[in-house]
Amino acid sequence: MNSETYWIISSNNWDLAESFGFNTNILETNLINLAVVIGVLVYFGKGVLTTILNNRKETILSTIRDAEERYQEAIEKLNQARTQLEQAKAKAEEIRVNGVLQMEREKQELIKAADEDSKRLEETKNLTIRFAEQKAIVQIRQQISRLTVKRALEIINSRLNLDLHARMIDYHIGLFKAMKTSAE
């Protein structure tokens, strides 16, 4: 029986169901019904839509603020990096200039030391030459003296005879006597 009742109810409602549907023709639809539906949607959906839009707006603004903060941080880091780069360039230039100056100082010191060594060597050479000259002069004088004495002895020995010898002795004795009388 249940199934018959169900059939009767459903067959009675079938006619009603055939008349239910959407009318897509805008001219045949009731504008009041549409206005009511839209009004209900606006009234009840306004809060939800406003909340969703506000949440979306806050999310976008938060994202923009975060992006701006990261942008500012990136700019600060970039400026710091540029400052450090400029400092590094300045330090490198200072090191280069100091290196060039140090190299120039060392070059001048080496030149000065080489000049001093050259002067010292020149003085040593001149002293050595003068010493060698003096030594040669002394040796030549000694040799000349020896040769002169030898030659003089040869001449004296060749000319010396008893008569000359006696005359020289007499001459020197006379000189001695003259010195003795002038001293008295």
Curated annotation (Swiss-Prot):
Q: Where in the cell is it found?
A: Plastid, Chloroplast thylakoid membrane
Q: Keywords in UniProt for this one? A: ATP synthesis, CF(0), Chloroplast, Hydrogen ion transport, Ion transport, Membrane, Plastid, Thylakoid, Transmembrane, Transmembrane helix, Transport
Q: Name one GO molecular function term.
A: proton-transporting ATP synthase activity, rotational mechanism
* One GO cellular component, as annotated: proton-transporting ATP synthase complex
Query: Where are its TM segments located?
Result: 31-53
Q: What is its main location?
A: plastid
Point out the signal peptide segment.
none
Q: What is its membrane topology?
A: Single-pass membrane protein
> A Pfam family in this protein?
ATP-synt_B
Q: How does it assemble?
A: F-type ATPases have 2 components, F(1) - the catalytic core - and F(0) - the membrane proton channel. F(1) has five subunits: alpha(3), beta(3), gamma(1), delta(1), epsilon(1). F(0) has four main subunits: a(1), b(1), b'(1) and c(10-14). The alpha and beta chains form an alternating ring which encloses part of the gamma chain. F(1) is attached to F(0) by a central stalk formed by the gamma and epsilon chains, while a peripheral stalk is formed by the delta, b and b' chains.
The family line of this record is: Belongs to the ATPase B chain family.
**What is the annotated role of this protein in its UniProt record?**
F(1)F(0) ATP synthase produces ATP from ADP in the presence of a proton or sodium gradient. F-type ATPases consist of two structural domains, F(1) containing the extramembraneous catalytic core and F(0) containing the membrane proton channel, linked together by a central stalk and a peripheral stalk. During catalysis, ATP synthesis in the catalytic domain of F(1) is coupled via a rotary mechanism of the central stalk subunits to proton translocation.
An additional note in the Swiss-Prot or TrEMBL entry is: In plastids the F-type ATPase is also known as CF(1)CF(0).
Q: Which PANTHER family match?
A: ATP SYNTHASE SUBUNIT B, CHLOROPLASTIC
- Protein's UniProt name: ATP synthase subunit b, chloroplastic
Query: Which lineage is the organism of this entry classified under, starting from the top rank?
Result: Eukaryota, Viridiplantae, Streptophyta, Zygnematophyceae, Zygnematophycidae
